[in-house]
Design a protein with these regions (language model features):
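Active-site-adjacent helix/loop patches that line small-molecule binding or acyl-intermediate pockets
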Residues: 2-155, 163
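Active-site-proximal alpha-helical segments within enzyme catalytic domains
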Residues: 159-178, 230-241
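Ankyrin repeat domain, specifically the short helix-to-loop turn at the C-terminus of the second helix
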Residues: 308-316, 341-348
Length: 349
């Protein structure tokens, strides 16, 4: 593994603000550690081509693709002992060929990356021109570009089901450990470094709006899929091919927004709690008990400040506990008359 520092020399971590297939590169200052012109991030085409070129560049294409398929397989629960629980992603060669025939923009990007010096060279020796006749000549083209593009097109042609993608997302949500195989596929540090890039750049030019509304790391694809990660809880794949102007699944985004409107999973939900949404990390009985118990404790102890806070959070102050004791009941029994007045003034019956 190259590690974050080495990879960061070749590819950035910044949102591009451009189309995913744009040929513009990120210009970095001379004092930065790495090359002066690199892809903005691994999510755009240029970054994906670059990262493909960084994977074991001295191995053969077959070895590199097998390694990548195995790693994807491990993300979704595949194990080397041929466990029936999951399979390695299928390589669709016909799709890869179509990418090659039509991917001229990506081919141009590959050579642009080579021109900047950021795409690693292969260690293949240059062939010598052995034709003495000046009308017969041959020349050698550095294969790093074609090899990186070939691998990139092949990765784009791997086939996975929605269940597979959801399991891969769950592995990322589980700090790099596959939930069904218990295989540590990625280190915790790698996952921590990956999720912020998904958050800032995973939804193309709608990444900022998506994170504001949904608040979760995500990655969309032009095939209509959305990979959604709820750290330490679950991974989700939403598949609906109809795309919006940014190239994201229309229903995938709507589903994600509805998820965070019902459950407390937004990254910044800790700063805004209300009773209209459930905390999926807590058992429902415990969640209801916590919500009710805090109000009852504050009422019985005369803690109006806590009750004011609960009102601002839109908590329900009329719910009773297992004995059907409500905050108003406890405040009256304990002689907390200021609390009784406060509750009545706020519509508690």
């Amino acid at each position: 593994a190259l590690g974050l520092e080495e990879v960061s020399k070749h590819v950035g971590k910044e949102p591009s603000g451009r189309q995913f297939d744009d040929l513009t590169l990120l210009a970095r200052s001379a004092s930065s550690n790495g090359f002066s012109r690199v892809p903005f991030n691994p999510m755009v085409n240029a970054g994906a081509i670059m990262t493909a070129g960084l994977i074991d560049p001295d191995d053969s294409f077959t070895q590199r693709l097998r390694h990548i398929r195995q790693q994807f397989g491990r993300l979704i629960g595949w194990t080397a002992d041929d466990s029936p629980s999951a399979e390695m992603p299928r390589f669709n060669k016909n799709m890869a060929r179509q990418e090659n025939f039509k991917g001229y923009n990506n081919i141009a990007m590959g050579y642009l990356l080579m021109a900047t010096g950021s795409l690693p060279h292969t260690k293949t020796d240059l062939h010598r021109d052995i034709h003495p006749d000046e009308d017969e000549f041959d020349f050698y083209i550095e294969p790093a570009v074609t090899e990186a593009l070939k691998l990139y097109f092949s990765i784009c042609s791997l086939e996975m089901t929605a269940t597979d993608v959801a399991m891969a997302a769950a592995t990322l949500a589980n700090s790099g450990v596959c939930p069904i195989s218990q295989d540590r596929v990625l280190s915790q540090k790698t996952v921590r470094n990956c999720l912020p890039v998904l958050q800032s750049s995973g939804m193309y030019n709608a990444s900022g709006t998506f994170f504001q509304q949904v608040g979760l790391p995500a990655k969309s694809g032009v095939g209509g899929g959305v990979l959604l990660i709820v750290p330490q809880l679950m991974g989700i794949c939403i598949f609906s091919p109809r795309l919006d102007a940014q190239g994201n699944s229309v229903r995938g985004i709507e589903m994600s927004k509805r998820l965070t409107s019902k459950y407390l999973v937004h990254t910044f939900d800790g700063t805004m709690t209300d009773t209209d949404r459930l905390d999926p990390k807590l058992p429902i009985a415990r969640w209801e008990a916590n919500s009710c118990g805090e109000a009852i404790w504050a009422a019985s102890n005369g803690n109006i400040r806590t009750l004011e806070s609960l009102v601002s959070q839109q908590r329900d102050l009329q719910t009773g506990d297992y004995d059907i004791r409500t905050p108003l009941h406890l405040a009256s029994a304990e002689g907390q008359f200021e609390v009784v007045k406060f509750l009545l003034d706020h519509g508690v019956k």
